[in-house]
Regions:
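Alpha-helical multipass membrane-protein architecture
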Residues: 1-580
Length: 580
């Protein structure tokens, strides 16, 4: 990619940037897209960057109106950037805790936050991340070693849209068609006719090997790629096809008398431990190696990671700190000094996450949260609230920090105004906090009975809950078989994490994805099978029609994800209102 060769002049005079229509379009798209990530996060533990969807829809609507209406102003490059900044900030709000620490806190303590306090908390940790990004911006964007791959992908799409308008219109049609198809399938399955979950035998059905009619899972499979897809398949076979029958045979897991159908809830109580251990150890090992490499490159380049605060932005930064600390004390009963201690840790870990994202494009939010949990497990042992909410502070701020750093990368290339981007990001997290919390409460009105089930596996919740439970109660609270499983899973994760980080890329690609391997232990086998199917289908199409796949695969997959998830949230709201 060579964006500077584009016919769009980079760093041109900025016109109509933070316009009412750019902001309002981003807000509307954020309202529509935020529930998609909440839904997907609770289903499979992953989310999707909504920047490209927002770019395509915003351009399609406003440029289409401009071409049909005499005198209507064209939709500018900078308005597109503000639109995607608002929408992606809203959709990325799940990093504020909605699909991991907040539900894990409810499962461990039995306490559920009301809507308004939950909105305030999610907004506060995200707001802190925005200000961390503001002060990291000059040093990180000036570091030539940090490419910010995700930001560059958004930039490439943005420039491509304005250079090839017809292509953008075609991609928008593909996006909407895929969304309509998956939404229709979900609506039929929910309201008209329950699509059968076929399985070859009753035994395989009991082990969760069924055909799940979810096009969202197929769409995610198309995005994750063949390596991750096949690893999910391998993990499902190992966990649910190998370990699960052995656990039942040895009596380590007992099923209710006369039980039939998938027995996910009973089996995952054991299987989640080796899976979580594998994921945590591999991500922490990989993060440690990346940090060492980044430390050496930063030291060699003599670059600073932080800039001296200026009075204006410093007031916003101070406000964000006051919000986070006071809400920890008021909502969770955390000691004020402990609450204050979460701030420097969150700043350090968000800075680490920003550099990792700049170098690799992969946000290590899970590893950041678990590292914070381990830190406070030492400082404040046996305290669930501080363990989870310190990690929530670190993970939430890191999530928004990395999202805004990618936007700053795009903004610098096209000559956008950083202050206006910051305002757009703040509006986005405000809208996302409200919509995300409402979507979460609509989907999961009773976390204690609904989460960690076949319908809502919530693997991120299982991970955070397991780490907090282990650090709070100690390993002695677990059975001997689970302790051995944790040890073996951790050892495998450590080995794979080290190999993945140290081997050359052309060799590391043949290793299984450690995140996917561990995740397959926490997801029903049916979910892993459908995601693997999506990955294999996309790979086969790319082998036959590589150009077609490059142009439309991600767009079609994003449509499948958005269509089912939006319909799923709407169906939950409808059923909730009907029951009310």
């Amino acid at each position: 990619m060579h964006p500077t060769s584009s016919t769009i002049p980079l760093n041109a005079t900025v016109e109509r940037e933070l316009s009412p229509r750019a902001v309002s379009t981003g807000i509307v798209l954020g309202i529509l897209l935020t529930p998609s990530n909440v839904y997907a996060g609770l289903k499979i533990g992953w989310s999707f960057n909504m920047s490209i969807i927002a770019l395509l829809i915003g351009y399609g609507i406003w440029q289409g109106l401009a071409s049909r209406s005499v005198g209507r102003l064209p939709w500018t490059l900078h308005e597109s950037n503000i639109n995607q900044t608002v929408a992606s900030a809203a959709a990325s709000i799940i990093s504020g805790g909605l699909v991991a620490p907040i539900p894990a806190y409810t499962l461990l303590t039995g306490q559920q936050l009301d809507a308004i306090p939950m909105v305030a908390w999610v907004f506060s940790v995200s707001f802190l991340g925005i200000w961390i990004a503001w002060y990291l911006r000059p040093s990180l964007l000036n570091d030539k070693a940090l490419k910010f791959p995700e930001g560059m992908a958004t930039l490439e799409t943005l420039l491509h849209i304005y250079n090839h308008g017809h292509e953008a219109a075609t991609r928008l049609k593909v996006l909407l068609s895929a969304a309509l198809l998956s939404g229709l399938v979900k609506a039929v399955d929910t309201f008209m006719w329950v699509i059968p979950r076929w399985s070859p035998s009753a035994q395989l059905e009991r082990l969760t090997f069924t055909a799940d009619p979810s096009l969202l899972l197929v769409g995610f499979g198309g995005i994750i790629g063949i390596r991750v897809g096949l690893t999910l398949l391998l993990g499902a076979v190992l966990a649910w096809g190998g370990l699960a029958p052995w656990l039942l045979e040895q009596g380590l897991v007992t099923l209710p008398h006369g039980s039939s159908g998938p027995q996910f809830a009973a089996l995952v109580e054991w299987l989640l431990w080796p899976g979580v251990s594998l994921m945590v150890c591999s991500t922490l090992a990989s993060l440690a190696i990346r940090l060492w490499a980044l430390h050496r490159s930063t030291k060699a380049g003599g670059g600073a990671i932080w800039t001296i605060p200026k009075p204006g932005p410093a007031a916003g930064f101070a406000l964000s700190i006051i919000l986070v600390v006071s809400l920890q004390v008021l909502l969770f009963g955390i000691n004020p000094w402990m609450a204050l201690l979460t701030i420097p840790l969150a700043i350090c870990l968000a800075a680490v996450a920003a550099r990792v994202v700049g170098a690799t494009g992969i946000p290590p939010i899970g590893a950041i949260g678990q590292l914070s949990q381990l830190s406070f497990g030492i400082v404040a042992p046996g305290q669930v609230p501080i363990n989870l909410m310190s990690a929530n502070t670190a993970g939430g701020s890191a999530g928004q920090c990395t999202d805004l750093m990618n936007d700053f990368k795009v903004g610098r290339a096209i000559g956008a105004t950083p202050r206006k981007q910051l305002i757009a990001q703040t509006l986005g997290i405000f809208i996302g906090s409200i919509v995300g919390v409402l979507a979460y409460l609509a989907l999961i009105p009773d976390p204690q009975t609904m989460l960690l089930t076949e319908e809502w596996p919530a693997p991120a919740v299982a991970t955070w809950k397991a780490v907090a439970q282990t650090l709070t109660l100690g390993l002695d609270s677990l059975s001997a078989s689970i302790r051995w499983a944790i040890f073996i899973g951790g050892l495998v994760g450590l080995l794979l994490g080290i190999l993945d980080s140290l081997l050359p890329a052309h060799r590391a690609r043949y290793l299984p994805s450690t995140a996917a391997l561990g995740l397959a232990f926490v997801l029903p086998a049916s979910v892993s099978l459908m995601m693997a199917l999506g990955a294999v289908l996309t790979w086969l199409v790319s082998c036959r029609w590589p150009s077609l796949t490059e142009r439309f695969a991600i767009t079609a997959a994003a449509g499948l994800i958005a269509g089912e998830s939006i319909t799923g949230v709407g169906a939950s709201l409808w059923q909730m209102l009907g029951n009310g």
